[in-house]
Amino acid sequence: METKSRFWKERLIVTELKEFLKKHPNTVGVEVMMPDNNGIIRGKRVDIHEAESLFEKGLNFCAATPLLDSGGDVIDGLILGSDDGDPDIFGHPVDGSLTPVPWLEKEMAQVLITLVGRDGNPYPHEARNVLSRVVQKLVDDDL
C-alpha cells in the first residue's frame, strides 16, 4: 500500500533529514518516538540507512500503540491489538523535531512522530489528534 497519503504529501520533510546529516554525518541511527495516551514514550530505532524511507514514506507502527496501558499491554476489551490482527498504521516525523542525542556513546538522533491511519487521515486515537479535534471544536464555537 502506498504510504504517501493525500494528507502527508505536502509534509514530507526529507530535506530536514538531509540538512541534519550534513551537520551530523556520523549519525548511525534514529530513535523514532511518540508519547502514548499515558504520556509514556513508545518507539522504535531505525538504522540511518532506513531513515530516508521514514522521512519519505513513514514507518509502520502498531495501531494499538497509543492505547497501551502503563505496563505496555493492550487494554482488555479494545478492538485494537491481537483481536483484530494487530494492524499497522503509519508514523510520520513531526516537522522540526529531529535532534541529536548527545548523551549516547554512538551518534544517534531522535525524532517525534505523529500517526496516520491507513485511510491517510490523522489517527483518531493519538493524543495529539484528540487534542486537535477538541481545539477545533472550541474554535468553531468561538471560544
Language-model region placement:
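ATP/Mg2+-dependent ligation/transfer catalytic cores
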Residues: 1-143
